[in-house]
Structures are given as C-alpha cells and as structure tokens.
Amino acid sequence: MAKGKYDGTLNLPQTGFPMRANLPQREPEILKFWDEIDIYRRIQEKNAGRPQFILHDGPPYANGNIHLGHTLNKVLKDIIVKYRSMSGYDSPYIPGWDTHGLPIEQQAIKNLGIDRHKTDVVEFREHCRDYALKYVEIQKEQFKRLGVRGDWEDPYLTLSPGFESIQIKVFGEMAKKGFIYKGLKPVYWCGDCETALAEAEVEYNEKVSPSIYVKFPVKDGKGVLPEDAFVIIWTTTPWTLPANTGICLHPGFDYVLLEVKGEKYLLAQGLLEAVAGELGWDNYQILDKYKGEELERVICHHPFFARDSLLVLGEHVTLEAGTGCVHTAPGHGEDDFHVGQEYGLEVISPVDDRGRFTAEAEKFQGLYVHDANKAVIEELEKRNMLLKAASIEHQYPYCWRCKQPIIYRATEQWFASIDGFRQDALNAIDTVKWIPSWGRDRIFNMIRDRGDWCISRQRTWGVPIPIFYCESCGEALINDETIQRVSELFAANGSDIWFAKTAAELMPPGCSCEHCGGSTFRKESDIMDVWFDSGSSHMAVLEPRQELRWPSDMYLEGSDQHRGWFNSSLSTAVAIRGAAPYREVLTHGFVVDEQGRKMSKSLGNVVDPLRMTREMGADILRLWVSSADYRNDVSVSPNIIKQSAEAYRKIRNTCRFILGNLFDFDPGKERVSYDKLSELDQWALLKLDKLIRRVTKAYEDYEFHVVFHSMHNFCTVDLSNIYFDILKDKLYCSHPQDAERKAAQTVLYDIINALVVMLTPILAFSSEEIWSYLKKEGQAESVQLLEWPQANDEYLNQAIENRMSRVLELREVVTKALEEARSKKVIGHSLGAWITIYASPEWTELLKATAGLEKIFIVSRAELKPETEAPAEALALEGVEGIRVMVQAAEGSKCERCWIIENSVGEDLKHPTLCQRCAEVVAQLQG
C-alpha cells in the first residue's frame, strides 16, 4: 500500500498481538495467570450440574523426568478434557501417579548406597516414599508446563493411605469370591531384581542362546522302544536340564526310530529331514515307526543325573523346530508344569532368588543360571550325550525394569485366578468401545489366553498382601474382619504400619485360626504387584471422589496397556463388579523417529520435550501431537517439529490479521446482519460453518489430526489465500464506517471468536493470548471458560457455495495468466493488470451475477467477452472448460493511495493522484 502523504488515511491493521510468538517467555506468564484465577476450579464451578465426561488418568510412574511418550499421552488427554469442558460437559481431570515398585526401590538403593537386606524396612520404605514424592512434584511441574489442566493440588497417588486402604478392600473382595489363591507354579522371575514378574512386566528382545541336541538313553522301553536307543531333544536353555523330569511327545505325531553310525535315535518324522541336515547325517536307516501315544510312559535316563525322565504326551508339542521330543522341566516352564501335573512329575527348581543354582543342582551349585549353560554343555560332552552345540539368535523374555534376561521358576506365589472370571471379562470387553477397533481383539485374545495373574512380589516398597498365617498349622487367614481391620489401619496410618507392627497388633482382637483354632499368627512378607495398585484405581479414585463416578467414560494410554493397565483394571473390576470400569478405551502408538525407530540415546534420536518447550514453546509440541494420527506410531524429529512450528506461524498470522483489522470495530453497535453481507462475506461464513461442523465431529471422534489439518487449511487457504487477499482493499482503503467494511469486520469477528475456541484444546497458551486481545469488558476472563461455537443452518447456502466454487476455479486461471504476464514483464503487481475473460454462455451468466470481479481477482479492470472472440494466445487451464483469459498492462495512472490503475485518477483537482473512490474517502475524512 501507499507510503506517503495519504498513509494516515488508510485503515491499516492495529494490534498489540505480536507477530513473534516468543512462546518460551510468554507461556510461563499465562501459566501464572491460570494459577492466579484458579482456572481448574473456575471451570468446575461453571460446569457443575452438567452431564459428566470422566477421563480416568492412567498413572505414570514417579521416576525420572517426562519424555515424549508422556507428552503425547498427557496432551491427548488434555485435548479431550478441554474440548468436553467447553462443549457442555462437566469433565474433571484428576491426574495420578504410580508410586510403588521396583524401579523406585532400585533408585533409593542407588542414591543412598544402602543394602535393602540390612536396612530397617520402615526406614527403607521412607527413602522410597521420599524418592517417589520428589518425582511426583518434578513431573507435576513438567506436565503443567505443557499446558495440561487438572486438579494438580489434589492428584491421586497409589502410596496415599486412602488409596492403599481401598486397594486392601479390593484384594479382600476378590479373596472372598475365591479368586485369590497361593500355589506352586512357574512364574517369570528376575534374578537381578529378586522377584516374580507379571506378564505385563516382561518384554521380548533378541538374545543369542546355545542351541543343543541332547541324547536321553532309554531305560525302560515298555516293550516298544529298544533299551539301546536314545530319545533326542533340542533346547536353547541348557541350564534347565538339571531340572528335567520328562520328555513330551505329541500323541498324534509320527515318530521314527532310525540308526545312524551305529546308534539308534527317536525323533518326529516331520522333523527328520531338518535334524538330519543340522546334524550332518548323510546315511541313516529307519528301523521303526510309532504314533506318539504308543510311546507314553517309556522311561529314559537323565543324561547326567541319577534320575528318570518319563515320556509324556502333550498337545503343545509342534513341528516348527527341534525334534518333536520336548525336554520337560516342570519347575521352569508353564506347559512343562501343566503336563507334569497330569503325569505326577516332580517339580524341581534348583534356583534361588538371585538366579543361582542351589545344592539341589549338585555340581552346578552357585552358578548363575545363564552362566551355567557352558558348564552343562561341557558335562553333556564329557558323558557323550551331546550331539551338537551351536548358537541361535531368538526372541527372549527380559525384565522391563532392569533389562536383564529372566527365567521361569516354580515358586510359591499368590495368584488371582483369571479362570474364575475369564468369561465375564470376555463378555465385558464387548460392552466397551475400543479405539482403534483392533484394540478389542487384542485385549480379548490376551484375556482369553492368559494364565493366572501372579500378584505377589518379593520386595519391600509396595502394598502388603493382607494375609496372616497360623503359627500352629501354617494355614492362611483372611476374612471380612481382618480385611476391614487392615483397611482401617492403612487409611489412618498408611501401609507402613504393616511392617512396623506385629501380626497381633494388626489383627482384630480375639482372632483364631479357622483350621486348628490357633491364636498366634505371622504376617505375609510379600507385597502386591504394582499392576494390582493401578488396577485398583477405578475403585480407589472414581468411587470415593465426589466429582467423579464409576465407571469412567474413558481410559487413554499407549497400546502396550492392553496387557497392562487396561487388563489389570478390567480384571479387578469384573471380579468385583462384574463390569468393565470404562466405557471407551483409546490407545495411541509409540513415539519413533522419522525412520520408525524407537527413541534411543545410543541412536542419538531422542527428542527431549523439556528442551523443546524451553526453546520453542509447549504449543509447538501440542500442535505436533494434534497433527499426528496417534493410532499408529507417531514420528518425531527436529525436522517434523520444525514443520509444526511453521504451521503454528501460519495459524498465528491468520489470527493476528483478524485482530489487527478489528481495532475499530464495536460488535455491540456495528454488527451487520447476515442478509446485508456481500456474497463473499456469506461464503466466508459458509466456510466457517462447515469448519465448525467438521472440527466438532473430529473432536467427538478423537480424530485430532483432522482438527489440525482442517484448521490449518482454513487459515492458510480459505482465509489467507482467498478471503483476506480479496478483503484487504475494502478493509484498508474504504471509509472507516463504510457499510461493506463493517460487514467484513462482522464476519472477521465471528471467525476469530469461533477459531479461538476451537484452537483452545490444542493451542492452550496461544488461544489464551489471542483471547486477551479479543475479549471485551464483561466477557469470560479466560478463553477456557467460553462455550463451543454452534453451527448455523442459515449459513449453509448451497447456491453461494456452488457459485463461489466456480468463481474461485476461474481465479486459479486468472492467477496463472497473471503469473505468465509477470514473468514476461508485461505487468508487475496484479493491480497493474487489465484482464479480459472470454467465457462460454454458462460462465458468462454466472460471472454477470457476481459482483466485484476486479476485487476478487485483485486487478484494476476485469472485462467479460464471449469465448468465441478469444485470441489464440489467450490462456486456458486444463480441467477448466469454457474459460480463456488475456492479460494486458493497465492503461491510466496509478492511485497513490490504493494502487489501482484507472482513468478517474487525476479527475479530482484537490487530490489529483487519487482515484475517485479514494478522493471521496479522503475528502470525508478531512471534513
């Protein structure tokens, strides 16, 4: 626009809203503002009495700083809660923390340099509590810095006395229904952590293990197998051979007895070719053939112990690998244990809590199990029982806490019997909406196939298992009275009291053993699995808090929680209530780099959200979260974050343009009714209305990437590239009180008021900043206190949409023609052009009904002629039929004020450098 004596007559944008966001400095100021007005309480008061939407927070672990996975999770939750609280719901959000468990124990040990076995239990637990609470406070501030709104002053903690008290009641109710039992079973065991693990605490990684073929000499062939034969097994865990008591065959498979180099071997016929190739058997002779069931109860010698190994039958045997004759150690495998129970095999597990062999393993005593592989192989070789030893890389279970390989180990543990409520849990799954829908099958299959839940842990920092044992007969005691007593004690004192008091002090007065009548008891020393802690949160949080209710509307966590929190919560809820604790379950993927790799310090691809917030601002991270289809793994890198920052800049500039052009607009006095708006203005409201409908549906469907792309496209294309571009002359050059200018300002005002609300769930900080410049006296103090914009059927004018769609199609042809003319130096700015549109009759009729073509195309003159008169050089655009455009340099003088070239420039003697429109405006302004 003009730079000269008429500058002061232009309505140039005026706003204090800065172009540069400066988010790292601005956002903390907004956080302070929210704290000062107590935004969470204000919103709860506003929404009191409305229908509720309860998103129950899955508790993050109180250990370390937050990472991008936390960011993705918490921002997704915050987007949902903010949307719900602005769209007619009472949507409280109570953040929580998982505060017990092994990692906190390990950190307390590491930080203090103490030996937990030599430290007073209560003192050690105090150190653990201090560590957990320290990181609760650290993470709390980090989550708040992301703009996440919640009841940060009163979160739920699994270590709080109230939570622990209710958890005891959950355990007691499950025990009362017969779902809790103690049994000897193989469980996942971590020797490094010295405790049992649940399935949810196990992850699988690649591991190189031995791969050996071993001979078991036949001792008693039961008249079927010759006594000079050998049964061949294959295993990748030689360390389990000291616990071998059986060899399992499939009853329906064919087995062959063959002779190789003077020795007779038994193996499955279906694996003969593979084994022969592996062992280098060039010449062998098949001597006999059997069904697996014919070989049942044949007895073999153990390869190096004076012990029998019984041939048993099991459906779990496959022909995928090995020999079809499966080494069976009931003390070290689930299938082995079950088949061993069926045949009465001895359960041998000669391994201590640290994963080292006991005296029962004889010559291997003291060896760490994984280190013992070499010694076992040497023993087999010495006894000529080894056919081959090699290595294999395969998936192996690891402890997800310490990242060390784990073992199966038969020990006495407390279990929750999934069989007791499995069918009810499977039925409950189909009452829940799973987002994405594949989540249903995933958890259904896990519940259907999972074994009983090992809920005991041999550690210190956790909620004790509230069981007493009779000193006289050893029977366990748990009943309504003991549970009520322990629950009350925990509510008043926390679970430390279990370790500080004797059994007699913890039990109700007058307790006696229900089995033998004894009156002296000892306490259970194990604690509960932390998944039982968080799995009880629906009872410990949703039930007692007045602002919440059971069940919740939504659980939202990473896809690994189908086997974790979703699973444990479903189990406890179905066991107690017979129903799921949630109505919807939404899962997101993991954060990966641009190549799809996990975040890893060794790969150097870790993106730190705290650093990103310090450098770029939390709103950029929030926009990144919204831009991704979180149902898959979510990619992040400096380049991707840069793209989010660029998208943010465009959205911010759009809002700044609107704010700048509303500086002299009073919506209370100057609004223009819809019927008096120009067709272009009505088109803008139509596009806004469609945006409101699309964005609202996308929020309802949790498709936040659709929200992002719709808003971004609206700002950059519909507004910046089209509406604003066309509007600038009217806004800047018309008389300030011009009716058409006020009409445009009315539309801009409605657009920004809708945009600022729809942006709030995502751009929490920037929307608040925008609102601070937009709000009028008497309006809501915070943008978060506003209501969601409503669609308006009056704006859905199909005729306008169709007509403007065609006109904008033509605008593309004109733009292309202007670009070509500019490249040929025919014109400079588009206002230096006259255009001639050669149109078909259909186009001619449409364009004659369209006012202000010059303004739409931003040229000085637009002339309409029949298509038949088009010269050969007139430009046509592929896909746009019936239109050709010619561009020529405009003739006449350029208006100094608006830059339009037209013949009226010079006609006004007082303002000879202005066009007629500008001369009249200036005259009015100067009085």
Curated annotation (Swiss-Prot):
Name of this protein: Isoleucine--tRNA ligase
InterPro entries in UniProt: aa-tRNA-synth_I_CS, aa-tRNA-synth_Ia, Anticodon_Ile_BEm, Ile-tRNA-ligase, Ile-tRNA-ligase_type1, Ile-tRNA_ligase, M/V/L/I-tRNA-synth_anticd-bd, Rossmann-like_a/b/a_fold
Subcellular location: Cytoplasm
Binding site for Zn(2+): 895, 898, 915, 918
One Gene Ontology MF term: isoleucine-tRNA ligase activity
Free-text note on domains in this protein's UniProt record: IleRS has two distinct active sites: one for aminoacylation and one for editing. The misactivated valine is translocated from the active site to the editing site, which sterically excludes the correctly activated isoleucine. The single editing site contains two valyl binding pockets, one specific for each substrate (Val-AMP or Val-tRNA(Ile)).
Keyword flag Membrane: no
Family of the protein in this entry: Belongs to the class-I aminoacyl-tRNA synthetase family. IleS type 1 subfamily.
Cofactor: Zn(2+)
E.C. code: 6.1.1.5
